[in-house]
Amino acid sequence: MNAPRCLRRLLERQWRQGGWLSTLLRPLAALTGLVVARKRNAYLTGARAAWRAPVPVVVVGNIYVGGTGKTPVVIEVVRQLQARGWTPGVVSRGYGVDVGAAPRVGQGQLAAADYGDEPALIARATGAAIAVHPHRPRAVQALLRAHPGVDVVVSDDGLQHLALARDVEIVVQDERGVGNGRLLPAGPLREPAQRLADVDAIVTNAGRPRAAAAPAAGAPRQLAMWLEPTHAQRVTDGATRTLADLAALPPARLAAAAGIGNPARFFQTLEQAGIRPAHTLALPDHYAYAQSPFTALDADLILVTAKDAIKCAALDDPRLWAVQVGTRLSDPDFGDWLSATLRARQP
């Protein structure tokens, strides 16, 4: 194992539990805290003005760096709003894509190379219009010009983008919670843990069914989210197989791969569905698939995430099957609450 990977794993362990390296990095974390507080206070006091869109804005983000499950929550938020008569559009940074000066706006079967992994997946899953650009207000403006029927904007991974005023803030976390509670680089947090008290809802990616927490007066709405696989779809031709079919296959015939923020969560989801591949391949988040990483895998079927499948199509490997999942929420009233909150906060 190479040195950078060993250091990364050590740091991730200490981000969860604390330790000597985390303690050593606390002075740098203090600097992070000063920068974060200064930026936030500038917007809270009006020293820096946040741009307010002519339509409501829902922000979905996290304070724990890396993958916590934001994309499935964005997709579910869009679907919940669509089911209640809204026409949502989505803005995102377009990670890994050189967007240029002008925002890029699209809809439907978008290419990850042009829009980024998450925006392409969100567009395909929801049909919503998407705009990508690092400057969120500029992305919203371009989105509304191109799609004037959009009446609510969902900002993907937008919690720290304070230049865009928001009406609802939703934080996504997973079983790691706030880890050791320290800011980067001594801990995993982009903002202090106290920031959670200011948001409207906290969605915990629980990995498995969990009851919703009873709402407390004045506190953020608390709910759990988990993913349930529904079926698998072959990347090359769209053929489908049931989960029962996959679970009945000998594990030696199966492999699974994921290039997402937390590959272990995908493998855990498969295991909970009774699918236990003999081989698993954890790839870096936003893996480009410029070359196939599967040539050495001795398997008849290779299961990948829907996000990976968008880029894997160019490999033309008939062994690749995308596991399609549905997002489940512990709070059956979440969509009604979100819609009512947005309408109540409209001018």
Swiss-Prot record:
E.C. numbers: 2.7.1.130
Mind listing the GO biological process terms from this record?
lipid A biosynthetic process; lipopolysaccharide core region biosynthetic process
Task: Give the binding site residues for ATP.
Answer: 64-71
Question: Per its record, how is this protein called by name?
Answer: Tetraacyldisaccharide 4'-kinase
The alphabetical list of record keywords is: ATP-binding, Kinase, Lipid A biosynthesis, Lipid biosynthesis, Lipid metabolism, Nucleotide-binding, Transferase
- What does the similarity note say? Belongs to the LpxK family.
- Which pathway does UniProt place it in? Glycolipid biosynthesis; lipid IV(A) biosynthesis; lipid IV(A) from (3R)-3-hydroxytetradecanoyl-[acyl-carrier-protein] and UDP-N-acetyl-alpha-D-glucosamine: step 6/6
The protein's role, per its UniProt record: Transfers the gamma-phosphate of ATP to the 4'-position of a tetraacyldisaccharide 1-phosphate intermediate (termed DS-1-P) to form tetraacyldisaccharide 1,4'-bis-phosphate (lipid IVA).
This protein's species is Bordetella parapertussis (strain 12822 / ATCC BAA-587 / NCTC 13253)
Q: Which GO terms describe its cellular component?
A: plasma membrane
Kind of enzyme, top EC level? transferase
Question: What superkingdom does the record give?
Answer: Bacteria
From the UniProt record, list the reaction(s) this protein catalyses: a lipid A disaccharide + ATP = a lipid IVA + ADP + H(+)
